[in-house]
Amino acid sequence: MTVSPPTDHRPAGTGTGTGTGAPSGVPGEAEILGRMGGENFPVASALLGSRLRARLVALYGWARLIDQLGDDYPGDRLAALDWADAELTRALGHPTDVALHPLVRRVALLAAEIKADPELLRDLIRANRLDQTAANYATFEDLVGYCRLSANPVGRLVLAAFDAATPQRHAWSDDVCTALQIAEHCQDVAEDAAAGRIYLPAEDLERFEVDPAELGAPGPAGPRLRGLICFEVARARRILTEGQPLVRSLRGRGRLAVAGFVAGGHAALDALADARFDPLGGAPHPRTRRLVVHGGSLLVRP
């Protein structure tokens, strides 16, 4: 299975800028799409064909644009997210407007093509607004509620892009995406703590007697924090496995792509285990070999 995403899939006529009305500091199309190769999970395998690749890249571009506005924008992030919300509304009404940010125009055209619920696109904005105001989550259920905005909409949009959406597939996809989000939170404990955010549930910190200050301390992690990460990894693995029937329910290129996402999740969790559940020594990254092994295993199952 090819796991390297393509470097560029701009349709003819799209630009590399930000449109005419974007606030200063909003990243352009080329900057966003140039980062695809560094992602944990395969965005668009070269085996998917140009039509599906273009659809996935449109979704990736929107998700990464919103994440960058919420995480890295140098100015007022809530105002930048408000701009993105307004830009999306404008694009949904006039998706061919050349004044739009190219990534917003691209995802609006896709939403019309696949008849996607625009609220799924807006959920990503809502999640990033929460990131500006909610520094932590008391319970695991609270964290799952956040994942319903930050991660699960992406899976549902991907299913729509594959013309494969059903209620059962939505449920499996939600499990997969929630697990992937938890894996990312485990990888990024130190980075999130530096940004003033704690995604590990407070009830779990208390259970494992982990002081929140430990999350941003210099490594290596102590035994209590390692125990907590081991617990979260096991929970994420269980949720990911519960969502795996999604792969078997799909056929053709959709099955290939979703197998890649699920395999990427298992490989990320493997990387945390290989690091002895220490999240403070730098975000553990999955090995390509592990990703291929997991992906192959998923694809050969009936």
PLM regions and their residue ranges:
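Catalytic cores of Mg2+-dependent Asp-rich isoprenoid enzymes
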Residues: M1-G15, G19-Q181, C186-P302
